[in-house]
């Protein structure tokens, strides 16, 4: 049985604002986690989250919007890394294109997240969001001698994109 935690609560307002409703009995992505369904007229699909206490959250995006959507919200302090199989849009800070085939990192808690998501392009991704309770406290206790700053590692990651060409597809 799924139980709500602090990490789920951070998404509730943003999800409701964009027409998503929680479906705690939806097992689309398994019995653990919370599935959200895009129930409004603005789009279709699902968003799934699974949080482990106040340590981390796994996320699956599998939805699209009928019209361009401006997303703007204050992301809590965290480190996020996400693989985008499909997406189209722009992030405003930092200014980067959102394109398919990218691994992107984001450091939350600094400034509001702002992005324009293009209409009718599915957002299909999987990611993990790691909280300070995990990357500053838990990892340091578990690996005190080997511990290196995960924050510094994320700052250097930024984004990595795979560019698909017709030549690569023929191999």
Which role fits each region the language model picked out?
Residues 35-160:
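N-terminal regulatory/effector-sensing and dimerization cores
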